[in-house]
Amino acid sequence: MKRTFQPSRIVRKRRHGFRARMSTRWGRKILNRRRAKGRCLLCA
């Protein structure tokens, strides 16, 4: 049985990256929440 986490930088950026977050209304809400919390890293 293979492991569930198969790392890929491209997939990570496309799914969870800054541009992906900015492209949807809910993604922008996530970014705003993380900014309000004071996160150093907003997304992948």
From Swiss-Prot:
Example of a GO cellular component annotation carried by this entry: ribonucleoprotein complex
Zinc found in the keyword field: no
Domain of life from the UniProt record: Bacteria
Gene3D superfamilies, per the entry: 1.10.287.3980
Alphabetical keyword list: Ribonucleoprotein, Ribosomal protein
GO biological-process terms attached to the record: translation
PROSITE patterns: RIBOSOMAL_L34
An example Gene Ontology molecular-function term: structural constituent of ribosome
Keyword ATP-binding recorded: no
Sequence similarity: Belongs to the bacterial ribosomal protein bL34 family.
NCBIfam families listed in its UniProt record: rpmH_bact
PANTHER family for the chain: LARGE RIBOSOMAL SUBUNIT PROTEIN BL34M (PTHR14503:SF4), MITOCHONDRIAL RIBOSOMAL PROTEIN 34 FAMILY MEMBER (PTHR14503)
Protein name: Large ribosomal subunit protein bL34
Species whose genome carries this gene: Anaplasma marginale (strain Florida)
